[in-house]
């Protein structure tokens, strides 16, 4: 059995990769995917601590986070599609105006 510390390290690495993806990327779709990666890192951390503490509450939180991530992805992709229809671009640097 793999020690839980490895899962915590993996979770931290995924969180850092997601944060780097949000900071470096300027495409809205890549930023949304980086956010999903960060949410999955939190899920891995919850399961790792759940494995260490022999408690099932971490798994319950994982299901809540998965449902929130699915709703966030649906709303985010809908907004990105609406922005693309109006501007023909999803680059963050070009989305500086509030007016159409």
From Swiss-Prot:
Subcellular location: Cell inner membrane
Record text on subunit structure and interactions: NDH-1 is composed of 14 different subunits. Subunits NuoA, H, J, K, L, M, N constitute the membrane sector of the complex.
Function comment: NDH-1 shuttles electrons from NADH, via FMN and iron-sulfur (Fe-S) centers, to quinones in the respiratory chain. The immediate electron acceptor for the enzyme in this species is believed to be ubiquinone. Couples the redox reaction to proton translocation (for every two electrons transferred, four hydrogen ions are translocated across the cytoplasmic membrane), and thus conserves the redox energy in a proton gradient.
Single GO cellular component term: plasma membrane
EC number(s) per entry: 7.1.1.-
Protein name: NADH-quinone oxidoreductase subunit K
Keyword Cell inner membrane recorded: yes
């Amino acid at each position: 059995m793999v020690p839980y510390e490895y899962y915590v390290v993996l979770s931290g690495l995924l969180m850092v990769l997601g944060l780097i993806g949000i900071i470096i990327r300027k495409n809205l779709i890549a930023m949304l995917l980086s956010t999903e990666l960060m949410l999955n890192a939190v899920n891995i951390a919850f399961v790792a601590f759940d494995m260490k503490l022999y408690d099932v509450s971490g798994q319950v939180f994982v299901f809540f986070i998965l449902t929130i991530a699915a709703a966030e992805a649906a709303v985010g992709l809908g907004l990105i599609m609406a922005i693309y229809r109006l501007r023909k671009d999803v680059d963050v640097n070009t989305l500086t105006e509030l007016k159409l």
